[in-house]
Amino acid sequence: PLIIRTFKQAMASMSRKHSNSSLRTERDLPMPLLLGTIVVIAILIWIIPTFPVSPIGALIVVIFGFFFASVSSRMVGLIGSSNNPVSGMAIATLIIATLVLKATGTVGTTGMVGAVAIGGIICIVAAIAGDTSQDLKSGFIVGATPIKQQIGELLGVVVSALSVGFVLYLLNEAWGYGTEDLPAAQATMMKMLVEGIMNAELPWGLILTGVFIAIAVEILKVPVMPFAVGMYLPFSLSAGIMAGGAVRFIVERIKGTDKEKKERTDRGVLFTSGLIAGEGIVGILLAVLTVFEVNIALDFSLPQILSLVIFIGLLLILFRQCMKKDK
């Protein structure tokens, strides 16, 4: 219901928007240019051999890309990037794309790779739409020109696309996807989903059980997406999320004005955002060292204890950063 409601609101706001506005802060890229670009990209997805996508698959990309980009940008613009349901959109697209491809005779490895390609493209579309919406919202606050921001966003996508392929290849060479060192939980789940639908081996009993659990969780007024993510992600990943949530729970209940509590939360978000970015950079550096067989491991008898101490130390630093008052 939320996604459908958001889509209707986004379409209503689009119909009221005039791209040829005389105001500098309301000038966007021309709509004919955007529509033409979408058509060209859809054709390229169809004809480039790297994407084993049929014309029907390219049409699915256009339809779902338009739908989910509108939803994603609207939700991020209203609430924030933390509420962008990228995983849910990608999985929904993956299921529908697999069923459509199977029904039209595109089966086997070709059909599965095509479905994953379609789901991956939609996942990227939703993620970029949310990020762009966040940037445009920030630009509006400071009085930026939307068309210039949009050109910058396009350049950023091109540059990142040129580098992300190398990073993915590097990670696969270093550890391999689906291994203990690089579980890739979401990718593994998508693989199992596509194989299950194509081979008619999907465990519908488990899926229906999950559906009823989700309904019960919604009735209890618990956000179902974080609940589901916590169930299928490895504990090594969800433990950090839980610990960060515990720190925020404590910080928000320490006495202070509403303004002070908001400032504490904002400082915590900034600090943890830096940790996430730093973890990604360190992961790439470790992958490079692994590929070139450079051993920098410390000879420590109980590495788990050292990791736990560092983890607790980071939580204490996070708490201190949240409670630190501006001078």
Regions found by a protein language model. Name each.
Residues 1, 33-49, 61-69, 94-101, ...:
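Hydrophobic core segments of alpha-helical transmembrane domains in multi-pass membrane transport
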Residues 1-63, 152-153, 298-305, 320-323, ...:
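Signature of multi-pass transmembrane helix bundles
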Residues 1-19, 67-75, 128-141, 246-259, ...:
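Juxtamembrane interface elements at the cytosolic ends of transmembrane helices
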Residues 14-32, 75, 138-143, 190-196:
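Cytosolic juxtamembrane amphipathic/interface segments immediately preceding
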Residues 27-33, 52-55, 59-68, 104-115, ...:
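Membrane-interfacial loop-to-helix junctions in multi-pass transporters
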Residues 41-133, 141, 170, 181:
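Membrane-embedded translocation segments of transport machinery
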Residues 74-86, 102-110, 120-124, 132-155, ...:
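Hydrophobic alpha-helical bundle architecture
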Residues 172-199:
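Membrane-interface interhelical connector segments
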